Structure formats: structure tokens, C-alpha cells
Amino acid sequence: MASASKKTSACPHHGGSLPPPKLVSAAPDTVAVWSDADDQRASKVSLESVIRPVDSFPDNTAKKPANKGISVMPRTETKHPLDPLSAAEISVAVATVRAAGANPEVRDGMRFIEVASVEPDKQVVALADAYFFPPFQPSLLPRTKSGPVIPMKLPPRRARLVVYNQKSNETSVWIVALSEVHAVTRGGHHRGRVVSSQVIPDVQPPMDAAEYAECEAIVKDFPPFIEAMKRRGIEDMDLVMVDPWCVGYHSEADAPSRRLAKPLIYCRTDSDSPMENGYARPVEGIYVLVDMQNMVVIEFEDRKFVPLPPPDPLRNYTPGESRGGVDRSDVKPLQIIQPEGPSFRVRGYFVEWQKWNFRIGFTPREGLVIHSVAYVDGSRGRRPVAHRLSFVEMVVPYGDPNEPHYRKNAFDAGEDGLGKNAHSLKKGCDCLGSIKYFDAHFTNFTGGVETIENCVCLHEEDHGILWKHQDWRTGLAEVRRSRRLTVSFLCTVANYEYGFYWHFYQDGKIEAEVKLTGILSLGALQPGETRKYGTTIAPGLYAPVHQHFFIARMDMSVDCKPAEAFNQVVEVNVRVDERGENNVHNNAFYAEEKLLKSEAVAMRDCDPLSARHWIVRNTRTVNRTGQLTGYKLVPGSNCLPLARPEAKFLRRAAFLKHNLWVTRYAPDEKFPGGEFPNQNPRAGEGLATWVKQNRSLEESDVVLWYVFGITHVPRLEDWPVMPVEHIGFTLMPHGFFNCSPAVDVPPNPCELETKESEVKEVVAPKALQTGLLSKL
């Protein structure tokens, strides 16, 4: 794949008629010095000897300052405020909290659920991007008559820790200021300070993999469980798989005063085959309730004897086991070659690709986060599109009312964590081409630091034709290949795999995509039994119907600087004109817009019959036709929950009742079901409660919450491992540009030697002569 070269736009109006911004000479330039308390009380110091007005900022990697422009300011910051926490920072945060424990018993009971960076106020992010980190963008800050207030340093980075005390069954949230954290190779100078701590009553934090492993061990050692397995012909406990599931909230018995799990049981056929598909033999009829705080089985009942399904000969998916061990022999290598390397540039977590730029983040709960998305648009400069993009929750409700399937209602982000379950990706398998990987650092349950190497993949993909036109009169044609930049990660939650992707396109589109694969969650059947709530996969084995819902949170900033809040949301429906004088041919239809003025009216559902979509517009920026600039949310395939409104899981997942929610930005509103959905007894917490404030959305800082899902009626072709299912949505420019931003994409060199490059047709052998055929 050839690398793209830079060209000016072919559209004379692209970029608009506004003149490029000029930096105004600051009269009394000042420096804001941040105190330890991180307030913005500034001591003012003359900057005449340090800074002077400039037209551009040099790269901080340059050894010598440019002749024209700003002298390189002394900067001690090595990490951007939006960068994920490093391993050293996590260690400091954990050590600081542990040292702050009231007594040894409290410190010994601390278990660390999550340690993540505290994302600062948007104004702090703007300061960092303007003056501390290349490509230095002072235009991000609003101009004032007195000139910019330029800090000598940024406030300290902060960590937020969710801590579960296993001895007291309490959950607490801590904020730690990471005043100085340097690598050990630089002297090991580590320092943190507790800013705040708070015990959160009546909640349970997400479960941890260490808890799941311990739960499996204690269940397999529980004598009544061993006897129940013997009743089913299983005496080797090494064959048994115990998958702990959070109990959700169905009644007061599930209250968060206890930390509970109800495991699902499976059984392999061969303990010497670690890659055997153990999910092919579910064990039903055994009820187990585990106290995860004290790690004891508190309820057990062998309720119903259901024979184990016989081993399915098609259950395995490894090369030596699938289809008799015979793989396809006609698959030839397909290589992605970029002889000049990729077209993207990476500086830390900052990514530039053609006209796009953004920052990559990662959290234990959400996984991949995309920050500060902007498009560099000619003379109009850097134009923001979104402040923050991420997948904040997913819910998987099952449709079988029988035990144990009715309680399968997983909140995979809020109960487990998408980021904590991420994969270490492999080149050539998970991603192809010239790849940049990013590692992710987490705390484990006891406070140690673990690293998932190659957790996030950044690479370019060819995506077919971008645009083409051939003049039928002259036969002359112009065609451009489409290329997209993809940022992705994959995670495993029990039996399912999910891939989360953000695609950036040359025509200004952003596509969010989820790829679903993995293994079905199955149930066992009695001999001769069938169920209407699922699909029979093999003798004695069936897959219940279920749904997957994903919630994307999009903090939009269309043409808005960090301090601005000039966005609004309109809904567009295509209407059919009534019969009459204006529609004598009965062919008329038109697009009708409706402004979503407040949160109460901004709870919306998809409507494919009216081609419904939503546009986020800037109320103070126009394109060359005088229309407001905007980006529109275009739904893909979608659905709503098929459970009745009284379903118990909807108490915690009220946000599933609509496909779109729009709220006014509030920094503490991050998760649609509240921060702690595990065993949450409070109905409608999160989005459904926030929108009751009915805040105005007219010219504000808006956040889109898009809920999209898929209804999975399993089929035999989903067994033993599911081919990838695709689902997602698109953010598309709508009047944001003055013409197509893709017209300046250079043409690819067409292959001229077609005779050598084209695939040769297979020539069939000549038919044998009749006489020879009769002899054979």
C-alpha cells in the first residue's frame, strides 16, 4: 500500500472563507503557578524574557529553538494529563492508599479493584495541548484582551482507586495526587498524597479474576458438590469448570450487604486436553451460592438431575480437533505491505494520521478510550469533533425463563471490566500491516501491577473504493482507494469475545464497530426434550436466545474549543408529503428537523421507516452556504430489549429502554447504570435518574449515549465457535465541510502490467477420447 502524499484541496471553497487565526501579542503575559492544592490561584510573573508572540510553535524534539517563534519553555511534564497511568504511577497510588489505612487490619484487608487516571477539567487539557505538548495548539484557548494565562507547570496527575476491603465488606474511593513519579532508573523518587477518600455505602464493586479463581477452587472442594458430580458420573474434579457469575439483583436476598456469586458449571471430557471446549457440556440442576467476601459456599442444592450431554464430536475448534483434523489446503498467503511504513505518526499516546489527530487512553473498565478527536481543515486549522469516545457498558440478557438462564444478565463492563479482560494481541492474527501497539497497565487484586503487552492495536487498512466517476462521453475516469485508520482492542468475558474498533476515514467519517465472537453459553436438555427459548445445537445441548447491548458514550465538541459549549442536537426524520397540490405525482418526501431542547425530550429510538438520524451542530459556526456545521449519528442495525418492562434486570439497565439519550455534560456522569451496577438495589440509577433534571440542551456541552444491540437466535453455524458478527454506528460530517474532504486524496498508481498481475484462469483438462475412456 503506497503512502499518501500531501496535496491541497481540489475544492476552492474547502476550508471556508474565514481567514487563518493569528496569535495576538499578549500585553501583560502572565504565568499561572499551580499550588499543591491544585487551585488556580495564580502568582503573576513577567514573561517578557521568556515568551514573545509567535505564529507557530516548534516541535519539542528540536535541539535548537527556531529563529522565529517562542523560546522553548522549561517544561518538567513528561506525561500528558490524558495519558493512562504508568506502572510506576499505579504502584505509587497503591502504596499511598495502603499507607493511609487506619490500622494494620484495614491495610491487610485492602483489595484493589481499579486504579485509573483522573481526567482533569477540559480547560487543563487545553492548556496542556496549547503550551506543553506538541504540536502546540494555542488556538485551543479563547483569546482575551489581557493575553493568555500561561502556566509554568500543570497540576499534578491524579489517580482514582476503587478499593474493596475484604475484611469489612466496605467499598471506598480514593483520590491520590501523584506529585512526583519518576522511573526507578532515574532514582526511584516516588511520592503520592491522598487528596480524598470516601466509603460508598450499599454497593459492591466489580469482581476480580483472582476472586473467580478462588471461587472455582472452593466450589470444587465442597463435599456436597463433589457428591453431586459423582451422581452425574464425574469423579475427576480436574474436568470441572466453574464460571462464577454475579447474582445481579432480583430480590432483597441479592442485596449488596453480601458479596455474592452464583456459578455456572461445565465439565470437560479429557483433563489432558487444555484446549478442549469445556462449554460443550453444561452441568444443570446444581444450585450454588458463594459468599465471595469470606469465600465459602453458603447455599447448595442438587435440585434436579439432568444427564450430562454426550461428548459432541464437533465441539472443538483447534486445528487438530476440528472436522477430523483436516484444514483447508487452498488458502494462500495474503500480505499487507507498506514499503515506506505507515502514514500515521505517534508521539507517546498522541496520534496523527493525515488530517485526523487524537489521543489514545485506556481504563480497566472501558478499555480503549479516544480523547480530543479533531480534524485539521486547511485554513480553518484544527477543528474539534469529540472530546471523548468510549464504550461504557454492555448488557447481555437471556430469554430463557428457566433456571439458571433467567439470571444470565451480565453487565460485562460494570461487573467485570472490559479493559481488565483485554488480550495481548498478535501480529498477523489480530491485526495486519505496519502496526503500533500500546501496552496497558493495571493493578491486580492485591495491589501488584500487571501489564498487558500489545493491548491496543493501531494500523491502517485498505477499505475498497473511496470514490469514483467515469465520464461516459470521454471514457475518462478518476478513482481513489479508501484507507482507514483503525484503533482496537479485544477482550474475553467468560465464553464470549468482543472486539471494539474505532475507524477513522479520509472523508471525515468515524465508525464505531463491535465484533462478537467466542462460544455460545449453552444449556443441557433431558433426553427427547426441546425448548422454544433456544436452538438445539447437538443431542442434549441447546443455546438460549439472548441479546447483546452496547452503550457508547460520546462527549461531543463539534467545532467547540474546550471552554465553549455551543452544540445542540436535532433529530431528522424523512417525511412523505400528503397527497394534494404539492404532491400531484405522489412522489414527494422531505427531511424534517426537530430540535431536542431538553433531556426529557431527548430520549429517542431508532426508526428505519423514517431514516431517523441525529445531528450535533455548532450554533455559532457556519459553512459556505450559511448552514450550521455539524456531525450526524447514523444508526446501524439495532434493537430494543425484548423482555417485558417488568423484567428484573431492567431495574439496573433502565438505559436500555431507548436507543439514544442526550445529556448536558457533567464530569461525574460517566456510566449509564451508575458506577456500581453489581447487586445494585436502586432502580433506574444512572441515565434514567440524571435526565429527570431535564437540563437544557440548547447551546450546551452535549453528551450522546447511543445504545445499540443485536438479537441472537443461535444457529448450528455458530457452533463450536461463532463467526464474527458485526454491529456499530457511524459519526458522519453533515455540513461540517464546504465540500467533500476526500477530493484531495491522491490517486494510487494503477497496475499497468495487467497480464502479469491478473489471476490466470484454470484450464480444464481435455476430455479423454472415447476409446481410451472405455479401456480405463
Curated annotation (Swiss-Prot):
Instruction: State whether it acts alone or in a complex, and with which partners, per the record.
Output: Homodimer.
Cellular component terms per the entry's GO annotation: cytosol; peroxisome
The protein's name: Amine oxidase [copper-containing] zeta, peroxisomal
Quote the PTM field. Answer: Topaquinone (TPQ) is generated by copper-dependent autoxidation of a specific tyrosyl residue.
Region annotated Disordered sits at 1-25
User: Where is this protein primarily located?
Assistant: other
Q: Which cysteines are joined by disulfide bonds?
A: C431-C457
Which spans of this chain does the record mark as coiled coil?
none
Q: Which organism is it from?
A: Arabidopsis thaliana (Mouse-ear cress)
The gene behind this protein is CuAOzeta
Describe its function. Answer: Involved in putrescine catabolism in peroxisomes. Copper amine oxidase that can use putrescine and spermidine as substrates.
